[in-house]
Amino acid sequence: EKADEKASQGIIGGLFGMRFPFISEGAMPCNNCLSNDALFKVQSDVIRHLAAERSCVFVGRCADYILREHPRCANVFISASKEDRIARLCGMHHIDAEAAEEMIEKADKRRSEYYNYYSFKTWGAAATYHLCIDSSSLGIDGTVRFIEEFVAKKLQL
């Protein structure tokens, strides 16, 4: 698969077309569908527009690549040990470790394929981000504080 997102124009039109009139011409290629590439274009337009208007936090969607020329952008990649990821999913979704591990593998594969296809970079590669952090080392709260401090220093806030 070229990307992990598929949606109908009706959904996208309702979410973006009405609220975000800045979406460029040609982003909606047909009446009943939205291709993966067109969806990426819509998402890119929305991300750029929002980042130009205000401070934002974007999770995924190749936002680091889309905003690569933005002067006030901090790109962070958060990882965690497989054990911590499995334990978190088991607790959140009340599933067994095997199901959690399968979910992780599928999600990571989709994320990697999507990111690598649209950004022409490698998902998770340290050189792609300003900061890479393993949340297993500091815990979730410690990781949040560390990232807040990093962003404040990087952007001179």
Which role does the model predict for each range below?
Residues E1-S55:
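ATP-dependent small-molecule kinase phosphotransfer cores
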Residues L50, A63-E69:
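RNA pseudouridine synthases
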Residues R61, K82, I95, K106, ...:
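Long, contiguous binding/interaction regions
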Residues A63-D64, S79-R85, L138-G139:
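Conserved nucleotide-binding/hydrolysis micro-motifs of P-loop NTPases
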